[in-house]
Amino acid sequence: MEIILANPRGFCAGVDRAISIVERALDLFGAPIYVRHEVVHNKFVVDGLKDRGAIFVDELDEVPDDNTVIFSAHGVSKAVRQEAKTRALKVFDATCPLVTKVHMEVSRVSRKDIECILIGHAGHPEVEGTMGQYSSDSAGIYLVESPEDVASLVVKNPEKLYFCSQTTLSVDDTMDVIAALQAKFPLIEGPRKDDICYATQNRQDAVREIADKVDLMLVVGAKNSSNSNRLKELASKMGVTSYLIDTAENIETDWLTGVNKVGVTAGASAPAVLIKQVVEALKSYGGHQVIEHPGKEESIVFAVPAELR
């Protein structure tokens, strides 16, 4: 059985930065350090930070006064920022800079009183943070997930609209929704470059590259990781039996029956150690050759805040 590794895979610059911010805050200020929401969607990473003294909370009212809080890579609403400021909490912002870019787009159209349509998944922390950049007294912001949502969408002024998207969506699905928006609202405007982040795009492209070369695809990533789920969905759409796994322990040996080539990739919040463990497990199940499939090299690095360097 050949093991074909997709490239790129695993950590992206935004995840690296977010984890580094929590680690550096713990190094400099000591435990406890509070983090609003999982800093990234990966249990292994979160548990490791918990062991070092990070405390993960859902809301700021769980953070005691005079403490340090870190906002997760997914970003937060303006209301959350204001609450932290009002309480004089020490804040470090681990929001991915590419998410911040979308926040700035939404804030800009809100100030101009332009209705905004966000393409994204309801309930995802990034979507909640992005929706929360839009002022409640402006024209309005709407969330759509599919062309069907677009078909039933009613806006106040079809001639004055702007769209943007969650950064971790399926590239193909997002293009379908954008096409539906442009067909229904010909004057709608959007970002010069789509909001899907480079890491999401590259990892989906890498799956496309190897999908027709493998009999099975394993995606290392958490069940609540948007970009990991999109990788699994993409491989499945391309006709490959695919599974999303947290760790090597999730591999079921009957998946490998009759499999000659297995592809391995990982979401942007999955650490290299978990990918390595999956490869080692596959070797123990009969994998005799590991092939690194060539892909796009990533050199982007996002700096941590100056106070933490």
From Swiss-Prot:
Binding positions for [4Fe-4S] cluster per the UniProt entry: C12, C96, C197
GO terms, biological process: dimethylallyl diphosphate biosynthetic process; isopentenyl diphosphate biosynthetic process, methylerythritol 4-phosphate pathway; terpenoid biosynthetic process
Keyword flag Metal-binding: yes
GO function term, MF aspect, one: metal ion binding
Details of cofactor binding: Binds 1 [4Fe-4S] cluster per subunit.
Pfam families reported for this sequence: LYTB
Enzyme Commission number: 1.17.7.4
Chain positions recorded as dimethylallyl diphosphate binding sites: H41, H74, H124, S225, S226, N227, S269
InterPro entries: LytB/IspH
Pathway: Isoprenoid biosynthesis; dimethylallyl diphosphate biosynthesis; dimethylallyl diphosphate from (2E)-4-hydroxy-3-methylbutenyl diphosphate: step 1/1; Isoprenoid biosynthesis; isopentenyl diphosphate biosynthesis via DXP pathway; isopentenyl diphosphate from 1-deoxy-D-xylulose 5-phosphate: step 6/6
Domain of life from the UniProt record: Bacteria
Cofactor: [4Fe-4S] cluster
UniProt keyword Chloroplast present: no
Positions of (2E)-4-hydroxy-3-methylbut-2-enyl diphosphate binding: H41, H74, H124, T167, S225, S226, N227, S269
The protein's enzyme class: oxidoreductase
Xref: PANTHER family: 4-HYDROXY-3-METHYLBUT-2-ENYL DIPHOSPHATE REDUCTASE (PTHR30426:SF0)
Protein name as it appears in the record: 4-hydroxy-3-methylbut-2-enyl diphosphate reductase
